[in-house]
């Protein structure tokens, strides 16, 4: 659950009279880990963002290593099970967002960001600028305000931690509610799909 700041030397040792100047090249967090040697073979290091109200939640999640970027909107009662299915390493939420299901998140890192990072209109503009499109209709994301808000906050955070644009993130994929068979948290754990009842990585079904 820790973050690591990676710095690179930018100054010239030959001309520097004191310590050589260094600059932050990237910040590695649980959800932005891309080093193959450190990744779990059975689990992607996914970064997720949540935004929404008591009626509807918007989710966005990104595999920074592959560039796979997805969004969805679901009812609050399905949120915990959906997070269990996706299994992100880190979740970004607004400072003012309450998480009543927080005890169920286990070891997932929760990162708070300013509320204004989740403004849906600003998020739509940032996403359009990133994808170089006039709108998000080509991705089927029109009208998904909570999901767009989450996606914008996620993209901003990912770019900030990597200190660069993310050209390999080239599309926004919309997952509609009902696309997947929903299993509650208890059922998923009892089936030992991805970890045993004792929390071990093996033996499991996947």
Where on the chain are the PLM-derived regions?
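Charged catalytic and DNA/RNA-contacting regions of genome-maintenance
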Residues: 1-206
